Amino acid sequence: MYAAPLVRGETLRKYPEIGTALDKLTGKISDEIMAELNYLVDEKKQPPSQVAREFLQKLGFKTSTQRSGAADIIVGSKNFTEQYLLAEMLVVIIENYTNLDVDLKTGLAGTQIAFNALLKGDIDLYPEYTGTGLLTIIQVDEETRDEIIQSKDQVFNYVKEESKKRYDVDWLTSFGFNNTYGLMMRREDTTKFNISSISNLKEYLDNLSNLNDI
């Protein structure tokens, strides 16, 4: 699934230049690049602000402006490395390609807290994932989920439309990398229960549930 900036509709109407500026990040971050940036922070212990700014510099973006006035908008993030990096990039791009002053509010503990902060206006935008948007924010029904889940673009379009309709928030264009959920299982258990895919796991759990019902 895609990662993209999620912005309050009210904020975007007031400052449409935000959308124009952040469109510059469209497709700029591949899976490999995102993994490398996370590595620099988690393993090399480099500050997310430094890693984000140096990455944007390498791409040729302007990064020298660092405003210190009263904030026009507030960028938020959840409380893990990838979010810190993306939020720092949003700040750099907005401050260097608009005349807006930006504050940063990081470490929001989870999707519901971050999204509620967005709705209340405590923050104006934050990085979010379309898979999370589909399942946690929109809470899509099972039939619709099964119809669109195999297509990243269909998920993006559905989440974008429903988010605007229900909450007046806008999904901007994707950063580029694919963010999906995965499951880890001990090798001996995969062999023991003949599980090599999520479908196998679902079948195993369904059978287990049926046995418990007997």
What are these regions, as identified by a protein language model?
Residues 8-12, 27-31, 152-214:
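A conserved helix-loop-strand patch within extracytoplasmic ligand-binding domains
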Residues 23-31, 57, 61, 95, ...:
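Generic secondary-structure signature for well-ordered alpha-helical cores
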Residues 12-16, 42-46, 50, 80-88, ...:
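Soluble non-cytosolic domains of exported or imported proteins
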Residues 68-83, 100-107, 210-214:
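Short, well-ordered beta-strand elements
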Residues 53-75, 199-213:
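Immediate post-signal peptide segment of exported/extracytoplasmic ligand-binding proteins
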Residues 19, 26, 49-56, 84-91, ...:
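Extracytoplasmic/secreted envelope proteins and their assembly/folding machinery
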Residues 14-52, 166:
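Periplasmic-binding protein-like
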Residues 85-188:
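Short, glycine-/small- and polar/acidic-enriched structural segments
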